[in-house]
């Protein structure tokens, strides 16, 4: 069988796992405020089990004590026996499909917040504040150390009594255990610090207490980093020594390795590598750990496709491959490999929409798979054929909304024609992929191209659809997903009508040549403005990106904005906040941009060759209004049915003519996920 290495069973402790692929611990943000797993939580993991995964380690940063708050990211609370029946539901759901399920347990120490819920006093070995979470903390006392050690043991007991297959102790991401390990955080001079053995003592006592509570038959592992990548942090050689120390105790069944610490904004970007990173960028660190330990080594980080996973396993670098974001993108990945449907796998593109939402306090979603984590609502991963009449469906627009609408309609068995005025599919994805940091996002379009071809959809590329062209096809349903245009006309003094400003699309698509001295004005503060600034600097331009917000890129998530900074600072891009673009005028062969400080009203001028404005998208609505009055439903979507994931009532109502719906940016600008979600939840019942 192809990819045979992925399908070899593995023994971890007393546990046999059916294959070498796992979903590693991550913060899902699906538990309740009280930390109990929900139907959403269970269904999210069960879908991976249905799809054939061998092992899932759930509950990234699940807490063992109430003074390590879990509410901020809705993780699991193992500090109470109330969690046990919830675990039983989760374990049953996974086991009935042949998968194993463990949970990560931890005390976060200083890596949290104190300003809410129980308002706890946070603790760390020496009371040193963490840069990312910014929370102050106290120096943990010896009595508290022993209490927390007991908390770990009781949490492990609850996992075992709940029917889970094991626990993973988090000693990564600067949680309490590895806070004790690190000399830059642990400045203690008592038995819990100082020497190597002193710094290891807390983790050792936790491991001993857990093992004493759960016995030898229950799987216990530890997740560590391979190198903190901090000037005075733990090096790879230090981590090899630590891994060997704990492995040699004989109390660990496995070690999971992550390639970086993450208690600074810069190192946080390493932990969940986005599309700017190469494949498996930290595999060498996991392989280095494997050389010195006698237990299986697990590793995730940018392992996205079966060829890559097979190469890693066949090379003996690690014993199990974590394909965590790969399973967020497609929980049926393993099943599709077995069925010879590799080209149908929806491959993760490293957009990090999932984890960046978590760092913004939101639930984890996938940029391209709108069904992920919505299984409990009835949003399907597998589209079933309709039992109703076959319909003629016309879709206008080949961006993400249009491609998803066409795909789902074809999967339902309908006759689908898609019009796209450009010569290629992709819409704004194609434009975004031209920026230095965003090229891999084109993988979304690649998957749709393969799917639309497989489904036999009538693609009419390079064809602008007008009402006559559409109606000549005698459609039953018309879906408009024809997008919008850059909104440069909001302020007439910007001079868009006179050609004084251009859009980010103009620059990235090559419609205009990059200037040599460029001002980018960005009101959106997401990827588009930062991408065009990075693109221009890459072309050798002198660039200043200005925003009326507090800083450029402020709406970009925590694992992504650092990679922009890494790219743009060396190119000497100037990043300026709190300035509004008032007007642009020509002076000789130069442009003068007049900026006003939001708070002081003081005005500044920039003399440049080019002004690029990123001000979002204005819907293209003319086609909609041309078709609206002739449609049976007057273009209206029943939002109650849409939000409840129910069929549109008009689908079951008889009548002459066509139904009309519009989705994506031709309604209002949102994002790629929103466009795909609207298409899926609208079309799944056609």
Question: Where in this protein do the model-derived segments appear?
Answer:
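Flavin-dependent oxidoreductase catalytic cores
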Residues: 1-396, 400, 404-411, 415-416, ...
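Rossmann-like dinucleotide-binding cores of NAD(P)H-dependent redox enzymes
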Residues: 415-455, 526-581
